[in-house]
Amino acid sequence: PSQADTRHRVDPRFYVMMFLQYAVYGLWLPIAARFLSASRELGGLGFTNYQIGMIIAVASAIGAIAAPFIAGQIADRYVAPARCLAVLLFVGGMIKFITAFQTTFAAWLWLSIAYAVLFMPTISLTNSLALAHLPDPKRQFPRVRAVGTIAWITVAWLFPVVWLQSDLAFRWLPPFFTGQELPNAPGRMIDSVRVAGVVSMVYAIFCWFALPRTAPKRDGAKTLAFAKAFAMVKQRSFAVLVAAALLISV
């Protein structure tokens, strides 16, 4: 290939980054409601629908609110984004792994909130890293981001096939492999949380050592820039929008 072609080629590291980013979430979230609600006799946790909503939706909403402060105030100003990404993912992976061994609603709720606060900023950090280093981000970023969607679909399909079924048979139509669900499938579903924790820690090591360095921006901006955003809540239309978004999230 010509030098120009090489210069405009997407670095494979960003494909790996985006795949692992969404594989971590896709491993456990699509089946979370089932193992959280399944009875303890079947190996589940026996939580109510209200409790499951708190664990999944409320924790995610709190994480999404905290994300701009962590990603914007810390990664963009004081710490290299790749290093910040690695730390958030490693600590989050440990929390996720510990969560898998908990059996009470309170433990799952607080650990899920802590995990969401750490994980949600990584979404914007991966986007920022890719956009900062891609030679032609307008054309190349959609392809890189699409790998994340492929990762979500792949792991959400592969884990149940490999770990929750037996006597698999191939078929030409999706999901391509079908079999008999194991009697203790709800109990084995919780293993997806453990695997997600391990994958997150491995991904963190990849981010620390493999991703390109991007220096934090020390542009003299206000230290507490998010205070300006909070001031917008005084505007009636913006306050209504925020309130509606929070209610929809719950």
What are these regions (language model features)?
Residues 83-97:
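Structural signature of the two symmetry-related core transmembrane helices
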